[in-house]
């Protein structure tokens, strides 16, 4: 045993909590950190990583699990104060504008409720996401210009009143329209509940409800943009996909189940912003755990860059004096259910539960009064912390980024709503609450106007309005926005398909006829480049493997191996400029690719023609919600269900027998359905 080993503190389980042992152990850890700092100072970052990897391998080889340690960082902001950039805007002015938007968003729902028609609406979600949305819209999310492709903003669906409220201030929506929230058939028009492009085609780029659709569609929008660039159809002028999501909807399998492709294909044009207000519709997201830590591990393990925004600036002085990480350890151990409890507790009660019997932590917390402790901000309401996170995410290279932002559901709505389990269902307020909130937000309305939830608009020449317009002009225009200018294609003459329309002298399957048509169209100089074959790992089933060598399978990294069938007439050919989207066994991802390709006329000004070919039973029945979303997004393309019928695949069992897809498809209003039996019907 070496001399240094003799000095390492050793304790049994019943001694490890003693004050003496804890002091010795903190000193030991401090020495290790100092040693690591010395390595960092003397060598490069690469050597530090190599050393840590060696230590990790040592621990694993001795049966010590490190899964939590390697995938989770402490429960604090990822970006320390020392690396925080200066804020480029006027926080006081931006807060005034945000308060006006908050009031009008709330007023929309209150006015709808006051009609007594049971229209519904949601107030609490936007209340929690308002600051992060405003920081993004004032400083980051760019519109399309001559030199920039433009960003796509996909919002958390329940926060739509806030986006409508901002568009109203910007002059993009009339007072009649926002006054008719959820009443679209009124004489002067109205607004749909959530982002529906078919209902408001000038505003919403993509449908983000129902929950779960936003994540998967945003991933595949980002991926399709890279696809277009790698095929030389879209110039590399930038453009990011910003997806704002809720922590509750991250449980949707369509979201978490598709995040791997984003890191695998290095989608650095994709940013997820997860609003971690710790609550879903009925109660806590993870009352017995920590949703931010859970999501960090999931995304970090999938190869994403993870940025956490948990604490506001008021915590920075406390971190500075937390030399022994006493406060940090308390932050790490408190559960989300307890953090939610803090949001509805007095400062005195918070302090008692937070400090318990820890004298050192109590000493740190004496720097805050009970009132200050009650009002201290979470990171999601701190402009500076949000700006730092968005700034780093927007500069990411080679990886997608997820920003996990801690907020409070119902923030600013008073003690009757903030952090309460009923916050999501809050649709009205008492007269006293309305007046109190208006006063707190600084809205200059009379008591009667507050009670009636009157909309408030500053003078067009006011400082607030000038600032808001100026910030959007700097970023190229207003957001969110959907474009309709695109290049059109002329349909090929029918005589190009004479091989099929004139009849064939022998019986062939309609699937074979379809593959031959696709092969012919891919060779057409006018429409061939715009064709996007999409296959969920069923190309050989449908006899489409011959297209592999003709069109190539898209892979952003090309093909760095020799396929086992390299010497055959239809080798598995992957290429950076490949045309076929081989989605693997992921129908949700395939439909998301179909949506991205079929709406390329809007987001990329290209008339792409997606043709998604699948086992018919795994179409409408498997991803019907995504198909409906494609209709809402006004997607243009062809869905081809192969091997249909109740008897076609009898041996496969009832889960493969399809006699009802057309019944399911018939309820999608803008989806035309056919059941072709002959090759000429496919051609026509």
Show the residue positions of the predicted features.
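Non-catalytic terminal/interface segments that mediate subunit docking, oligomerization
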Residues: 79, 83-105, 126, 144, ...
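Cofactor-binding active-site loop characterized by glycine-rich and histidine/acidic residues
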Residues: 84, 89-101, 105-115, 122-265, ...
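Acidic, glycine-rich active-site loops and adjacent beta-strand->loop/helix elements
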Residues: 157-161, 185, 245-252, 275-280, ...
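Short secondary-structure boundary/capping segments
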Residues: 168-172, 257-262, 286-296, 313-316, ...
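A glycine-rich helix N-cap at a beta->alpha junction
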Residues: 172-184, 264-275, 300-304, 628-646
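Active-site phosphate/pyrophosphate-binding segments
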Residues: 191, 490-496, 504, 632-684
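Long, well-ordered, tryptophan-enriched scaffold segments
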Residues: 276-503
């Amino acid at each position: 045993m070496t001399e240094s080993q003799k000095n390492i503190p050793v304790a049994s389980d019943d001694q490890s909590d003693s004050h003496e042992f804890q002091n010795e152990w903190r000193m030991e850890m401090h020495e290790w950190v100092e040693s690591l700092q010395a390595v960092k100072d003397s060598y490069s970052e690469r050597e530090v990583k190599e050393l840590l990897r060696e230590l990790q391998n040592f621990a694993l080889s001795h049966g010590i699990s490190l899964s939590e340690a390697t995938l989770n960082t402490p429960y604090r902001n990822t970006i320390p104060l020392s690396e925080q950039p200066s804020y480029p805007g006027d926080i006081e002015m931006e807060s005034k504008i945000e308060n006006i938007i908050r009031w009008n968003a709330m007023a929309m729902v209150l006015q709808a409720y006051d009609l007594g028609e049971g229209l519904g609406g949601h107030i609490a979600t936007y209340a929690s996401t308002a600051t992060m949305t405003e920081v993004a819209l004032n400083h980051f999310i760019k519109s399309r210009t001559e030199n920039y492709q433009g960003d796509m903003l996909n919002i958390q669906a329940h926060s739509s009143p806030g986006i409508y409220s901002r568009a109203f201030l910007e002059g993009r929506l009339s007072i009649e329209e926002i006054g008719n929230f959820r009443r679209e058939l009124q004489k002067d028009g109205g607004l749909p509940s959530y982002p529906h492009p078919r209902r408001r085609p000038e505003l919403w780029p993509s449908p983000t409800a129902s929950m779960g659709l936003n994540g998967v569609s945003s991933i595949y929008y980002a991926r399709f943009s890279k696809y277009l660039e790698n095929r030389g159809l879209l110039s590399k002028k930038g453009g990011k996909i910003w997806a704002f999501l809720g922590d509750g909807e991250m449980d949707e399998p369509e979201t978490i189940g598709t995040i791997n492709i984003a890191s695998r294909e290095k989608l650095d044009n994709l940013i997820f912003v997860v609003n971690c207000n710790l609550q879903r519709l009925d109660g806590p997201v993870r009352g017995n755990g920590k949703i931010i830590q859970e999501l960090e591990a999931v995304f970090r393990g999938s190869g994403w860059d993870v940025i956490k925004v948990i604490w506001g600036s008021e915590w920075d002085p406390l971190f500075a004096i937390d030399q022994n990480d006493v406060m940090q350890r308390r932050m790490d151990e408190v559960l989300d259910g307890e953090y939610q409890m803090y949001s509805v507790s007095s400062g005195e009660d918070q302090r008692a539960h937070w400090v318990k019997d820890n004298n050192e932590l109590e000493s740190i917390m004496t720097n805050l009064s009970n009132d200050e402790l009650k009002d201290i901000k979470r990171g999601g309401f701190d402009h500076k912390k949000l700006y730092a996170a968005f700034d780093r995410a927007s500069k990411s290279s080679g990886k997608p980024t997820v920003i996990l932002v801690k907020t409070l559901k119902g923030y600013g709505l008073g003690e009757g709503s903030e952090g309460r389990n009923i916050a999501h269902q809050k649709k009205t307020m008492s007269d006293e609450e309305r007046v109190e909130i208006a006063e707190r937000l600084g809205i200059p309305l009379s008591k009667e106007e507050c009670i009636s939830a009157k909309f408030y608009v500053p003078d067009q020449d006011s400082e607030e309005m000038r600032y808001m317009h100026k910030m959007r002009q700097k970023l190229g225009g207003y957001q969110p926005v959907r474009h309709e200018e695109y290049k059109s294609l002329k349909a090929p003459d029918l005589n190009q398909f004479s091989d099929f329309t004139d009849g064939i002298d022998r019986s062939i399957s309609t699937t074979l006829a379809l593959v031959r048509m696709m092969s012919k169209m891919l060779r057409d100089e006018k429409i061939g480049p715009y064709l996007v074959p999409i296959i969920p790992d069923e190309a050989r089933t449908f006899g489409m493997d011959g297209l592999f060598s003709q069109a190539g399978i898209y892979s952003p990294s090309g093909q760095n191996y020799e396929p086992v069938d390299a010497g055959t007439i239809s080798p598995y050919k992957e290429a950076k400029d490949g045309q076929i989207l081989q989605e693997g066994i992921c129908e949700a991802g395939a439909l998301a690719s179909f949506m991205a390709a079929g709406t390329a006329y809007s987001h990329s000004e290209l008339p792409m023609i997606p043709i998604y070919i699948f086992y018919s039973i795994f179409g409408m029945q498997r991803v019907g919600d995504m198909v409906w979303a494609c209709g809402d997004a006004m997607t243009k393309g062809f869905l081809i269900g192969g091997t249909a019928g109740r008897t076609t695949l009898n041996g496969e069992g009832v889960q493969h027998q399809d006699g009802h897809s057309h019944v399911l498809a018939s309820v999608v209003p803008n989806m035309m359905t056919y059941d072709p039996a002959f090759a000429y019907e496919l051609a026509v």
